[in-house]
Amino acid sequence: MKMSLDKLYEVIDKKKDEFVTRLSRAVSIPSVSADVTLRPKVVEMADFVVSEFTKLGAKMEKRDIGYHQMDGQDVPLPPIVLGQYGNDPSKKTVLIYNHFDVQPASLEDGWSTDPFTLTVDNKGRMFGRGATDDKGPLIGWISAIEAHKELGIDFPVNLLMCFEGMEEYGSEGLEDLIRAEAEKYFAKADCVCISDTYWLGTKKPVLTYGLRGVCYFNITVEGPSADLHSGVFGGTVHEPMTDLVAIMSTLVKPNGEILIPGIMDQVAELTPTEDSIYDGIDYTMEDLKEAVGADISIYPDPKRTLQHRWRYPTLSLHGIEGAFSGSGAKTVIPAKVIGKFSIRTVPNMESETVERLVKEHVTKVFNSLNSKNKLAFNNMHSGSWWISSPDHWHYDVGKKATERVYGITPDFVREGGSIPVTVTFEQSLKKNVLLLPMGRGDDGAHSINEKLDLDNFLKGIKLFCTYVHELASVSP
């Protein structure tokens, strides 16, 4: 195996420019699932994925999953891409998952470069929307197959593939498909590998064994039939924006403390054993400062910082739709405003209970305002938290592969973000799920100037190659 891997590493380095060009083509497709006008681009990205894998000999198909309501209209959901590479009954079979949609991005948001043009700086940082989340890892799998074909090395496992275009907008339709195909298309899977997380910091690789869940809500406050002149009507009517700000100010304190009654009662108790795990993780407050670009930490030490990032819930305010947000001054009273916020959930929180508690709190606060405006509460989407065991044989495979590529034992960590499909795969297939990151903790997924370091991209491809060879040799 060592000789084969060394040759694979050499060809990956040799084909670096080709692999970067492929990633550049992927980034150039603005596959923003949250923008109805860009939905055709999400479909275009699905076609790109199908084409690239098909060229390498994979059997690919697109599954239509119907329509959904978006911006008041019925919109086709992007197809889910399924694929199979190899069907040798003597080999292990791994199901890989990635997503090909991305978060919204524009120069007006503050990007230093065009977000849909992959730009490489003199430090080897590749900037572009989706570079790390999640087009880089997806292109990494394509490149791993190509490296094997280039050398005529037999791919050591069978690959099943599941790629979606709605991950950044709630993964609508995916859960039903996975459950329907658990004993059909996905029946031969021995394990599942997802590459949609990141290192904790910038220097040491990790394997992720836990994720927080998410419940995303919006509150709509509506009053007049149209926007009003504040000089004419200010002080004479109940203003929707004032009501909304009053409600949102009761959700969370500036120090992160959630103010909604009952939320913290659901959280699993921190045991001494779990508490001690955080002592050995390679992370500093300087890592946090570097990742966020400012010294704005709530807690003074890494231990409490990581605990509140991974194992405690958080509530974040995301924005207000319908309010004036342009440059200059506009003295308008908005007729309708929509406040958006989410709660990251942890063991043992249940989404249904969280929704009930939030709705009760929001309704109670609104009623106390004695406003004549109208309130509407909506749960936009929810996904459960997930915890696995780092002692599973599959995680040992990931550990050995990481050690081979990086020369260091990875930290086993949890992640503050959410990948609801992880729970669905584990529950439906009854197979272990490994989260195998490619990018670093400062990549800025979902933020402006999202990037993926060239070194992580190339070593990530090598990691995928090593992972499948280690997987082929293990006896569970």
Curated annotation (Swiss-Prot):
Predominant subcellular localization, coarse grouping: cytoplasm
One GO BP: glutathione catabolic process
InterPro entries for the chain: ArgE/DapE_CS, CNDP/DUG1, Cyt/Met_Dipeptidase, Peptidase_M20, Peptidase_M20_dimer
Enzyme Commission number, as recorded: 3.4.13.-
Positions bound to Zn(2+) 2: H99, D133, D196
Cofactor(s) recorded in Swiss-Prot or TrEMBL: Zn(2+); Mn(2+)
GO molecular function: metal ion binding; metallodipeptidase activity; peptidase activity
Enzyme class: hydrolase
Gene Ontology cellular component list: cytosol; nucleus
Binding site for Zn(2+) 1: D133, E168, H446
This protein's UniProt keywords: Cytoplasm, Dipeptidase, Hydrolase, Manganese, Metal-binding, Metalloprotease, Protease, Zinc
Compartments in which it is found: Cytoplasm
Record's keyword annotation contains Hydrolase: yes
Entry annotation: catalytic residues: D101, E167 (proton acceptor)
Gene3D superfamilies: 3.30.70.360, Zn peptidases
PANTHER family, per database record: BETA-ALA-HIS DIPEPTIDASE, CARNOSINE DIPEPTIDASE 2, ISOFORM A
Subunit text: Homodimer. Component of the GSH degradosomal complex.
Function comment: Catalytic component of the GSH degradosomal complex involved in the degradation of glutathione (GSH) and other peptides containing a gamma-glu-X bond. Has a Gly-Cys dipeptidase activity.
Family, similarity comment: Belongs to the peptidase M20A family.
Protein name: Cys-Gly metallodipeptidase dug1
Organism: Schizosaccharomyces pombe (strain 972 / ATCC 24843)
Gene: dug1
